[in-house]
Each structure stands twice: as C-alpha cells, then as structure tokens.
Amino acid sequence: PSYEAVNVSSGDIERAKEIQFTWAMASYFSWYCIEKLNLEDILYVDADIYFFNDPSILEDFKDFGSIGIIENRVEYSPVNGKYNVGIVFFKNDKSGRKCSEFWKNCLLNSKNKYAEGYGTCGDQKYLELFPVLFEDVFEYDNFIGHLAPWSVNNHMYLPDKKISWGG
C-alpha cells in the first residue's frame, strides 16, 4: 500500500491495502470510460480542485495531445511525485488507450515492475512515467492554474486578487 494509505490507517497495513483504492480509482475509471464505454475521450477532474481560470477552457486543450496531466502544486517530494491525479485527460486513440490501460494495470498489480523504482502514492506516482513511456503527453499547467485543499496554504494571495502559483 502507499505511504498515504498506511498513514491514514494509522500503520495498519491490511487496512491500508483496502482504503488505498478509495482515492486511487481515477486510473480504473478513466480506462473503463475509454475501453468499455468507447468514449471519444475522458477528462477526469477531482471534485476538490480549485481553478484560477474558467475550467471550461480545459475542453479547448483536447487537441494538444492524447494524454494530459498536471503538476503537483506543492514542493516536489519523491513520495508524492511531480504530477497530480487531480486532472488527467485521455483521448481514445492508440497512445491514450495504451496509457490508460498501463495506469490501470499498475494500480491493480502492486508488484508491477515500476512500483519499487518509482513508488506508487496510490496511483499518482505512475504519472511520472507517462511522458517517458508514451507519446503525445502534455501538461495543462501552462494554461490553467489549480489548487486543492491540501495545497492552498503553499501559495501566495496577492492584493490584486491574483494567486501566485509558480510551483
């Protein structure tokens, strides 16, 4: 189980294995929408994401690539990783399908060949492999700002009602 699951379960490893899937379903959900529902694409957005810009512009970025991801808005940690599962996009094309299946399979097989070297953080650490293993990966961060309740305190609110979100 991930570090977060062990932490939330107060060190109970068996309980951690169970609760890890509570917040790590984006991979399976995305794969299911592409593979079983045959949707043109899937844009997964966590319910607790805060946007600095109108989130409807996310729709405009579908042509930027087959796989879209966002960076964490906290200082880099090897446990949490560079990217965040808060917003993930897959197009129903060769690269998008392969990547969503890869991500789902990593989560379902905790002994996969990447888990030890990359860590897991539920399903989040595998996002670091997307630009390495797949083509047409783009980052939304250059276009739309985002935060979540757990990262709000790490950012500066400026007098002109802007939020500094440089990292």
Question: At which residue positions do the language-model features occur?
Answer:
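Conserved beta-strand scaffold positions in the cores of enzyme catalytic domains, especially
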Residues: 1, 67, 137-139
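Short, P/G- and charge-enriched loop/turn segments at secondary-structure junctions
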Residues: 17-18, 75-76, 161-166
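Short, charged, surface-exposed secondary-structure boundary motifs
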Residues: 5-12, 76-82, 150
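Conserved aromatic-histidine-acidic binding/catalytic patches
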Residues: 18-22, 91, 115-119
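Active-site-proximal specificity loops/subdomain of glycosyltransferases
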Residues: 1-38
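Catalytic core and acceptor-binding pocket of nucleotide-sugar-dependent glycosyltransferases
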Residues: 95-167
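Short, solvent-exposed loop/turn segments at secondary-structure junctions
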Residues: 3-5, 49-51, 73-75, 93-96, ...
